[in-house]
Design a protein with these regions (language model features):
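A contiguous active-site-proximal alpha/beta segment in oxidoreductase catalytic domains
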Residues: 93-155
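C-terminal helix-rich "cap/oligomerization" subdomain common to oxidoreductases
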Residues: 1, 62-64, 287-327
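Beta-loop-alpha module in the N-terminal Rossmann-like domain of NAD(P)-dependent dehydrogenases
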Residues: 17, 46-105
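C-terminal glycine/acidic-rich active-site capping loop/insertion
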Residues: 118, 232-303, 325-327
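Rossmann-like dinucleotide-binding domain that binds NAD(P)(H)
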Residues: 152-221, 227, 303
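Hydrophobic residues in well-ordered beta-strands that form the structural core
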Residues: 88, 113-115, 237
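N-terminal Rossmann-like dinucleotide-binding module
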Residues: 1-44, 172
Length: 327
């Protein structure tokens, strides 16, 4: 018997959810909802409702919540009370307090509560994590991320840290399999909005790994890089192209003095890996489905989403206070 799924929120991300949800084996997208209608044509003949109550009344087992961040708590709590499994877009909520209420509601109801931290499902990062787990990099020393691009007019209710930086917070802790212990950050605002447009942050994980993150939506150049440096070299994942490259530590002496000034005293092999590249959004939906069926727990839980939001708020606190924040 198929899982009856619904979608609330038909904006820029919601339309992509609608497309992918139609393709997930073992599920059936039965209805969608958005109080502002369906300007992207995502419903495509499905019942289109205005409220979450109407969506619940139609009969759904699971719902993807792609409404603005400020509405995550209200919509999520109504779905939890109705016994509906939910995957909410990231960040989990507008603030840690609201996120905690969502975690508590879904835990108490025994429901799957997931958060759409889609970067975990990027094939380049999944390959990287597998190779790190197998010991190919040895001990990890540092994780650095760069996430830059043009200003997205669609974002209005949160700043760049909660909208984009949460990607890097989540994937960093996930790759290292260690939570953040300390952060220090600086922010900059260029727009007339009340939120930050740029952040530069450093951190330390509980494992001792150091991190640094550059995130902004002020750059004309789109960049999505994760660099993990360890005792045997460095992995570089480009999540725009889903490419993974390994830079091996130098083993061959550089005899050309002028070249060694730029590249160092030795060189190692550089390998770009070939692997299957599934669409991250589809892989994310399959993980949500499998969690509902009890087959595996590869989805990002609301508790993990809450941890990520707590780190994001700690970065903002650090930027405001000018001091490091310990978690």
């Amino acid at each position: 018997m198929s899982i009856r799924t619904g979608l609330i929120g038909l904006g820029m991300m919601g339309r992509h959810h609608a497309r992918v949800m139609r393709s997930i084996e073992g599920t059936e997208l039965v209805a969608v909802a958005d109080p502002f209608g369906d300007k992207h044509g995502a419903a495509a003949g499905l019942p289109l409702f205005q409220t979450v109550e109407e969506l619940i009344a139609h009969g759904v087992d699971a719902v993807v919540c792609a409404v603005p961040t400020g509405l995550h708590e209200e919509v999520g709590l109504k779905l939890a009370a109705a016994g509906v499994h939910v995957m909410v877009e990231k960040p989990i909520a507008e603030n840690v307090e609201a996120g905690q209420r969502l975690v508590d509601a879904f835990d108490s109801a025994g429901l799957v509560g997931a958060v759409g931290h889609i970067e975990r499902f990027n094939p380049a990062l999944q390959q990287m994590r597998k190779r790190i787990e197998s010991g190919e990099l040895g001990d990890i020393y540092q994780i650095a991320t760069r996430r830059q691009g043009p200003f997205p007019a669609r974002i209005a209710d949160v700043g760049v840290v909660k909208d984009l930086g949460t990607h890097d917070i989540d994937l960093t802790a996930w790759i290292a399999q260690s939570p953040f212990a300390e952060v220090n950050a600086k922010t900059f605002t260029a727009s007339e909005r009340p939120h930050e447009d740029m952040i530069v942050a450093t951190g330390r994980l509980a494992s001792g790994v150091i991190t640094n993150h550059i995130v902004n939506w002020l750059s004309p150049m789109k960049e999505r890089l994760t660099i993990v440096t360890g005792e045997r070299g460095a992995f570089v994942a480009d999540t725009v192209t889903a490419d993974l490259t390994f830079y091996e530590n130098g083993s061959v002496p550089t005899e050309w003095d002028a070249l060694s000034a730029f590249r160092g005293v030795s060189e190692g092999n550089v390998t770009r890996y070939a692997f299957a590249k599934a669409e991250p959004l589809k892989t994310e939906h399959e993980a949500f489905r499998d969690g509902i069926l009890g087959n595996r727990n590869a989805y990002v839980s609301m508790r993990e989403g809450l941890d990520t939001l707590r780190v994001a708020e700690s970065m903002l606190e650090s930027a405001d206070s000018g001091s490091s924040v310990h978690l």
